[in-house]
Amino acid sequence: WKALTDQVLLERYGMTEIGMGLSNPYVGERRAGHVGQALPGVDAQLFDEAQKPILEENVPGEIRIKGDNVFLEYWNNETATKESFVDGWFCTGDVAVLDKGYFRIMGRSSVDIIKSGGYKLSALEIEGTLLTHDDIAEVAVIGVEDETWGESVSAFVVLKPNKTLAYVDLKGWCDGKMSGYKIPKALHVVDALPRNAMGKVTKPALKALAS
């Protein structure tokens, strides 16, 4: 990209409510797969489900943001505004870990975090690995309610033309590429993944199919 455009790509993190909050530096270490550190004037902190700040690294938590960059309120929606703030922190709904001082996004807490066997798994991370399979064109990973695991990992895949894939073969391929508890326990081969008007995969629709 640098050779083609003479521009440098930066992985960053932002949303409508906060503008840009986290960024890899313009000058300095840029880490692939990470969204960097809080920008000047922005406070960023991970919180656990008990509303306590997470001080350790590599422990998943919700990103919360403070600063002059944060919006004041949702227009004519006092309830949504109140639900979005805790002790002055804006709750983004996104889960991340701190990795050597840099934030790494795991996904949306509502659809991309799978709670399985006591672990919090990133569907995005599993999807990224599965996309390196030679026969897989598209993939979406979800958590499906399970009496034993809480949620079990389930993969929906669109295969490349004229390819087939059995679950036993996928499981064997995953061995050594990801921890055993991350390996999908079910495989669904579909013609296409359901998407919304923005082109994003609608994982709730996949949950309905899986059940």
Role assignments for model-derived ranges:
Residues 39-42, 136, 184:
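Core-facing hydrophobic residues within beta-strands of well-ordered domains
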Residues 2-3, 37, 132, 176:
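Solvent-exposed polar/charged
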Residues 1-31, 43, 50:
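Gly/Ser/Thr-rich phosphate-binding loop
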Residues 14, 67, 72-73, 83, ...:
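AMP-binding/adenylate-forming catalytic core of the ANL superfamily
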Residues 10-16, 36-38, 142-145, 188:
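Beta-strand->loop->alpha-helix junctions that form or flank phosphate-binding loops
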Residues 43-44, 192:
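Generic short beta-strand
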